[in-house]
Structures are given as C-alpha cells and as structure tokens.
C-alpha cells in the first residue's frame, strides 16, 4: 500500500511518553504523535532518521505522525495501524497461499470475548478468523514479538484455539514491518506466557504465519513468508 499523504524526513530526539516524540524538522524542534504503544527502544534512538506523515485532522496538537525509522540502513515501519491494511491488501490480492479461497473479507469481528482483525468466509461458507500482529523488533536478521508483555495478545491466541476446536479455521499472522529478515520467533525473554500460548496454538492446529514486508519511503507491502522458530 502506498502512503496517501505527505511524507517528511526528520531527526529523532526523544520520546517523553508512549504517544509522543520530539524530532527536528526544518531545523526546528517539533512534537509529533507516535502511533505505536510498544517500546521501540531498539529503533527510536537519538539521532536516527525518521519518517513523518502529515496528519489529516486540522488544528491538532501534533501535526505529524512518526510512522517509520531507519535502524542503520534498514527502514522499519512502526505505525500500528498499518499491518491490518497491508494484510487486507494481501488477502484481496491472494498473496497468502493458504487463504486464497476466502473471498469474503470482514474487518474487526467479535467471537467469544475477543474482537479479531479479520473474519474470512469462502464460497462454501467455511469461516476463518485471522488475527494480525505487527513486528518491529529485529536483531541480525531475526525478528521477535512482542517487544513488551501483552496479556491481550495471549488472550487472542487462546480464543483462536477455542475457535479451532469448534471446527472453524483460525490463524495468526505476524507481519514483520521490515525487509531482509529471515526468521521469526516469540520473544520468550520478554513475555514467556505469550510464547507458551503460541506453541500450544500450533499444537492445537491454529495456523501461524510470518511474512516480511517491502518497506520504502513511499509504500509498504507484504512480501515473503519467513521461517518460524517456536
């Protein structure tokens, strides 16, 4: 998907809280919005180059959103709203092999006590629930999720297991918002319970996908599946 707004480059200074950051744009210090509540400590370091997207709401306190950052030569998209849009585009364009038969795509559907990112249905009325997780934590070509403990993430996985037991399809896709990575694993060091739940889900037949992305200063799109090591 292409960014449908003005993109500017800036220099990252600091992040006083989860939702805001200070950058230097056109030689002036500016407060911007960070659309990602994760820590991103390995990415947002003082002096790194970041990408800003012009906000569409007039008169808001932060005129730009900080949507991506360079980690050395690697551009990482950190906008938490992007993964669902990228996956939806991939589903429509039949880029996820196991899900190509699902033509009916619905967003934000509830089952049990959870709301899932996608509810899919094929021509035979088979139902499949799909949850999307954006991945930004990378080291030496290997990626992990989450970068902070996530009780909600574990809850989603356990609900997917129940969906599978009821005879419906269930899957979780880790969208790695980075190019040139070759492996994905749960971050057991940060959240061992999430890793335990993911391994249980695999055992119970829940599909686990991990895809990297083509990330440029103009667009981001789903690229290739990567190795999953549980």
From Swiss-Prot:
GO molecular function, one term: DNA binding
UniProt xrefs under Pfam families: SfsA (PF03749), SfsA_N (PF17746)
Family listed: Belongs to the SfsA family.
NCBIfam families for this protein: sfsA
Protein name: Sugar fermentation stimulation protein homolog
Organism: Clostridium perfringens (strain SM101 / Type A)
């Amino acid at each position: 998907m292409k960014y449908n707004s003005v993109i500017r480059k800036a220099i990252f200074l600091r992040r006083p809280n989860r939702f805001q950051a200070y950058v230097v744009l056109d030689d002036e210090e500016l407060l911007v919005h960070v659309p990602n509540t994760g820590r991103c400590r390995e990415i947002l370091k003082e002096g790194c180059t970041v990408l800003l997207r012009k906000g569409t709401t007039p008169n808001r306190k932060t005129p730009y959103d900080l949507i991506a950052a360079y980690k050395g030569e690697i551009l990482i998209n950190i906008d938490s709203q992007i993964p669902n849009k990228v996956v939806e585009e991939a589903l429509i364009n039949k880029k996820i092999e196991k899900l190509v038969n699902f033509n009916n795509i619905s967003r934000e559907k509830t089952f049990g006590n959870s709301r899932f990112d996608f509810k899919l249905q094929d021509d035979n009325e088979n139902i499949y629930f799909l949850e999307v997780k954006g991945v930004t934590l990378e080291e030496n070509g290997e990626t992990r999720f989450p970068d902070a403990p996530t009780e909600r993430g574990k809850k989603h996985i356990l609900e997917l297991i129940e969906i599978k037991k009821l005879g419906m399809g269930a899957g979780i896709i880790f969208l790695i918002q980075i190019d040139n990575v070759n492996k994905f694993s749960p971050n057991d060091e940060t959240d061992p319970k999430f890793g335990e739940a993911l391994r249980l889900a695999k055992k119970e037949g829940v599909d686990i996908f991990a895809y990297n992305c083509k990330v440029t200063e103009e667009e981001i799109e789903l690229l290739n599946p990567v190795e999953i090591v549980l």
